[in-house]
Each structure stands twice: as C-alpha cells, then as structure tokens.
From Swiss-Prot:
It comes from the Bacteria. This is Uncharacterized protein MPN_027. PROSITE patterns: GNAT (PS51186). Pfam families: Acetyltransf_3. Gene3D superfamilies: 3.40.630.30. It comes from Mycoplasma pneumoniae (strain ATCC 29342 / M129 / Subtype 1) (Mycoplasmoides pneumoniae). GO terms for molecular function: acyltransferase activity, transferring groups other than amino-acyl groups.
C-alpha cells in the first residue's frame, strides 16, 4: 500500500472500518489519526501498559516516530473505527527476526464486545496471512478486562509460543493439546496488575523443547514482589532478574530447553542466540 487504505469488515452485522497506514510517521496532519492519538493519551493514566508508552511518547509526532522506529519495513499501523468513532489501534511488523503484533482498545468500548470481536478477527487474520514462526504478542490492556477478554478467547493473558518446526502449526495459544503435544499449563487469571500469582505461572511439560514466553509487566509493587518470589523459586540469579527489569518493553523472555533449565535473556541476547 502506498497510501492509506480503508478496509471494511463485519461482526454480527455491525460494520467496521479499518484504516491501514503504511507510513504512519508521515501522517501527523491526518485528523483521524490525530483523534486516535488523543484518545490514546486521554486514557493513558488508567492503563498500566499504556502508561509505559506514555512516558516515552509526549506528543503525537513522537508517538508516530516511536512506532515507525520500532517496526522494520513491512510495518503496518492500523486504526479501527466504527461510525467514525475510534475504537483502537494495531501494529504489525518485526523486531529483529520476530514478527510482532500489538494492539490497544479504547476502554470505553470494551464492554460492548467490540474488543473481543476485533481481537478475534486480527488473531485469525494475521495467523492466516503472516504465518510467523514465532509471534510476540504485546497486550496493551487494563487489568481485569485483559484477563476477561483473554479467557473468552480461550487463552490466558500470559501468551506463550512454541518454536514451530517445518510444516508444523505456527502459533500455540492456551492450554489445549495439539496432536498429542501438551503445552505449558497456566492459570487463567494471570495478566496485568496486582493480582498475579507468578510462582504458579509456569509448569513445564516433557514434550516441549523451546518456548518463548512474553510476560507483560507493570510497576505495581506487589507484582514486583511476586516476580522476585518466582525467580527465587526457580533459582535464578540476581543478575538474571536485573535483565528482566532492564528489558526494553517491560517484558520477560525466557528460554526453556530439554534439560528443564530456565535461562532468562534480554531481548537483544535472545535475538543474538538465534
């Protein structure tokens, strides 16, 4: 796409518009994009995940530059509208070798089912079209809503992904078995906020060899305590804990190998080992 593209799709008879922006950093003067960003900034104090971006992004131009700088060629910023009302935004692109899909839904729209329907649509769409070997999912959501939506979609707020072999399914979600392979068991209430039970998060199984686990993290003190307790339980060193807290997106990447040992990498270290 060389210019903005308006796509239309339906959920249960309701018609939505998707504005796909090929070059978001060049659209500072676009009124709809500016309105979308205003909504983003308006709700930033109520969303723990969004707060982090708001600290980096102080104005609209910086927001677009932030998105543009992080996504390599082939990037796409999509803004979702219904009846000219902004509902949320999506980004798809790559960080290093990793395909990345991120989204944010306006909290005022979540009770209407729009968020659930939209997430379902994009999940199926990008699985079908991108077919990434691994997918890192950044979940820009609020505490209870993120868990509720994730549960309704059939997987917990803790997203994890199995490195696919040739001709194997590209992405694994939830706690379902697939062709006899058990995935990691997780608790359905895990997600953003202070309700984490991090020491109960991960139960490795024998059949998995490599897993990349992307855990959203916010700055609540009790979440930090729970995370530290989890690290202690798994006998990880203080240096490895620091890697987690220094991780650029406030996320944790863990590599789990066949020897059942846990190794924590920074994002850059993880890419280097690939």
């Amino acid at each position: 796409m060389d210019k903005n593209t308006i796509l239309e799709f339906c959920f249960f008879g309701d018609r939505y518009q998707l504005m796909a922006l090929k070059n978001p950093n060049k659209l500072v003067k676009n009124k709809q994009v500016k309105a979308a960003f205003n909504v983003f900034m308006k709700h930033r104090t109520t969303l723990s995940a969004t707060n982090y971006m708001a600290q980096i992004v102080e104005n609209f131009e910086q927001f677009l530059e932030y998105i543009h700088d992080k996504l390599q060629p082939g990037k796409l910023l999509a803004l979702l509208f219904k009846n000219k009302q902004f509902l949320g935004w999506f980004c798809v692109g790559q960080w290093g070798n990793m395909p990345v899909l991120s989204f944010w839904i306006d909290p005022s729209q979540q009770q209407s089912g729009v968020a659930l329907e939209t997430i379902s649509f994009f999940l199926k769409y990008y699985q079908r079209t991108l077919q990434p070997r691994e997918l890192v999912w950044s979940f820009y959501e609020s505490n209870q809503r993120s868990r509720h939506l994730a549960n309704k979609l059939g997987f917990p707020s803790l997203f994890y992904f199995k490195k696919a072999e040739p001709n194997a399914p590209k992405v694994y979600f939830g706690t379902k078995d697939f062709k006899g392979e058990s995935v990691i068991e997780t608790k359905p209430y895990l997600g953003w906020g202070s309700g984490w039970k991090v020491n109960q998060m991960l139960k490795p199984t024998k059949n998995l060899t490599v897993n990349l686990i992307n855990i959203g993290f916010d700055a609540y003190a009790d979440s930090q305590k729970a995370l530290l307790a989890w690290f202690k339980t798994h006998k990880l060193t203080k240096g490895q804990v620091e890697v987690f807290f220094n991780y650029e997106l406030c996320c944790l990447c863990i590599s789990y190998n066949h020897k059942q040992s846990w190794v924590v990498y920074s994002f850059q270290q993880l890419l280097a080992k690939r």
